[in-house]
């Protein structure tokens, strides 16, 4: 392969996790913060000789986590899925935006879907932009899917005034 195709990857793993048949999850380590970031829902099985073959697209530092540590990381990330505001009042005809709490690292997010409980009162687009249509109340549901496939739904109640 050409020299331009060579990437440096450093992978860390706890030696006791390299037992044949164990499943490990590959996560990337943010060089600036040291934070572990999800890259996919895929798990890697340790082979009989104690080796693991993992595919990565990007250069960087990675860690292989055992199932327990991967669940702890996933739970921590799911807890960070929160909205800045769970209630908002918007005047009819005006716009608002769904914003996430600053603790959510968007690098862990694969997909976000937004839905309105009453499209006659409030509409919301794929980017979280809200438009107030008429006076009333509606709930905007925000479903966040992480790169490991886990999901969490959070809600924002919108009151539209005349």
Tell where the protein language model's regions lie, with residue ranges.
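Surface-exposed beta-strand/loop patches in extracellular or lumenal glycoproteins
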Residues: 8-19
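Solvent-exposed serine/threonine-rich low-complexity stretches and specific carbohydrate-binding patches
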Residues: 38-46
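Short, small-residue-biased leader/transition segments that mark boundaries at the very start
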Residues: 2-7
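Exposed beta-strand face motif in extracellular beta-rich ectodomains
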Residues: 22, 60, 136-140
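Extracytoplasmic soluble-region selector
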Residues: 68, 72-162
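C-terminal beta-strand-rich structural cap/linker in extracellular carbohydrate-active enzymes
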Residues: 51-73
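Beta-strand-rich binding/interaction modules
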Residues: 23-28
């Amino acid at each position: 392969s050409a020299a331009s195709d060579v990437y440096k990857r450093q992978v860390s793993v706890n030696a006791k996790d390299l037992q044949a048949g164990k499943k490990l999850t590959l996560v990337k380590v943010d060089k600036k913060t040291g934070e572990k970031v999800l890259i996919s829902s895929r798990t890697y099985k340790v082979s009989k000789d104690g080796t693991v073959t993992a595919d990565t697209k990007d250069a960087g530092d990675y860690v292989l986590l055992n199932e327990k540590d991967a669940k702890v990381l996933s739970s921590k990330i799911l807890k960070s899925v929160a909205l800045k505001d769970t209630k908002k009042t918007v005047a009819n005809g005006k716009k608002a935006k769904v914003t996430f709490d600053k603790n959510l690292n968007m690098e862990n997010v694969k997909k976000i879907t937004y839905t309105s409980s009453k499209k006659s009162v409030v509409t919301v687009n794929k980017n979280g932009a809200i438009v107030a249509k008429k006076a009333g109340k509606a709930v905007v549901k925000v479903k966040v899917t992480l790169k490991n496939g886990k999901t969490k739904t959070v809600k924002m109640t919108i009151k539209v005034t005349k």
